[in-house]
Amino acid sequence: MNQAPTGIGWNNIEARRWLVDYYKREQTTDGKNDSRLFYTLWYDGAASDFPEYPNQLIYGSPWNSDWGNRVFIKKYSTDASPLYYWNDNNFRSLRYADMLLLYAEALNELNATPPSKAIECLNRVRNRVNLPKIEDSKYYNGSQISTNKDAFREHLKIERALELAMECVRWVDLKRWGINDQATLDELKARDSDFNNFIIDKSIRMPIPQSEVDNNPNLNQNDQY
């Protein structure tokens, strides 16, 4: 049974700045920043990025305080709750947007070019946050994404990162897309130093506890451990 995220929380796990930058690549159809950024992350400069929202106080300090380049996780938080270890936001095990993006990905893989239904599913997710249709994007090459299988696949990776950040799907996505492939790993390392210690064929799995291996002669330790 999953507990709901905490009211304010700890900072044992932080996001990386590239995620903020990716959210800010595109503006909405009315010229504002993607609202998912506001509801997903805390970071220095958020108040100026979203002047339409109140500059709330956290532990008595405004959330545009000088945090340097650090990025904190906000999704599911109650923002300013004084209570620890719980809140009344339910954790979504599977969201409709996740299903739409997975369906779009599957349709793309089953066809030579992205079918119209795949593009429709992608645009439904974008439309919910008032982003333009991918064909009309002012940042991405929408005409290529909507007609080229490989380009559509690569863009879906970005859309899933933005829509589903902090929802426990990223690792599954990376494994499905081939994190055990050197080219994919190099691309990840270029923006996220956390992957610098990732070793092909080893780090994709955790080691089996050695005590379990010692107690069971039929159990083989995972490769390279």
Predicted regions and their residues:
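Polar, glycine-rich mid-to-C-terminal structural blocks
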Residues: 1-26
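Acidic/polar-rich alpha-helix caps and helix-coil junctions
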Residues: 28-225
